[in-house]
């Protein structure tokens, strides 16, 4: 679980990087689609899966809206993200393993874009946050 220190670390980083959330989301999604090509199966309705495509950029933005919501609901992610969990489980039918893949890509992009802010201690806290976020999004799969 997240300690108070972890939560404060994540909130402090989010305050610094949230202005770039759209770019982070699009870059992370594009990276996931490239590095883990099996994830493309959820986006077969898109004609262009390239990093510069409008669809990738828009969905990257939506992902980061969800991350922002998670930051604001960090004290109870399971309850705070219940609607998102239901949507991904029942409507979109996303394999919950993909949340971990995307989390990894988000960590990579944040570390590239914000190397000074993303030291080892921050990395640990953000990684724990994303693990808890993935777990909360997987809640309705049980």
Curated annotation (Swiss-Prot):
The modification N-acetylserine is found at residue 1. Keywords: Acetylation, Heme, Iron, Metal-binding, Oxygen transport, Transport. Pfam families: Globin. Residues 1-142 form the Globin domain. Red blood cells. GO terms for molecular function: haptoglobin binding; heme binding; iron ion binding; organic acid binding; oxygen binding; oxygen carrier activity; peroxidase activity. InterPro entries: Globin (IPR000971), Globin-like_sf (IPR009050), Globin/Proto (IPR012292), Hemoglobin_a-typ (IPR002338), Hemoglobin_oxygen_transport (IPR050056), Hemoglobin_pi (IPR002339). Heme b binds at residue 88. O2 binds at residue 59. It comes from the Eukaryota. GO terms for biological process: hydrogen peroxide catabolic process. The keyword Methyltransferase does not apply. One of its GO terms (cellular component) is haptoglobin-hemoglobin complex. The keyword Membrane does not apply. Displays a strong alkaline Bohr effect, and at low pH exhibits the reduced ligand affinity and cooperativity that comprise the Root effect. Belongs to the globin family. Heterotetramer of two alpha chains and two beta chains. Can form polymers. Involved in oxygen transport from gills to the various peripheral tissues. This is Hemoglobin subunit alpha. It comes from Chelidonichthys kumu (Bluefin gurnard). The lineage of its organism: Eukaryota, Metazoa, Chordata, Craniata, Vertebrata.
């Amino acid at each position: 679980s997240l300690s108070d220190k972890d939560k404060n670390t994540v909130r402090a980083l989010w305050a610094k990087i949230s202005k770039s959330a759209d770019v982070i989301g699009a870059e992370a999604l594009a990276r996931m689609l490239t590095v883990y090509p099996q994830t493309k199966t959820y986006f077969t309705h898109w004609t262009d899966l390239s990093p510069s495509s409008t669809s990738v950029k828009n969905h990257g933005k939506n992902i980061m809206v969800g991350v922002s919501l998670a930051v604001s609901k960090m004290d109870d992610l399971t309850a705070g993200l219940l609607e998102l969990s239901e949507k991904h489980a029942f409507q979109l039918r996303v394999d919950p393993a993909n949340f971990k893949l995307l989390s990894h890509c988000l960590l990579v992009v944040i570390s590239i874009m914000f190397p000074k802010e993303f030291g080892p201690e921050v990395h640990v806290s953000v990684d724990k946050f994303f693990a808890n976020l993935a777990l909360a999004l997987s809640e309705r799969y049980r």
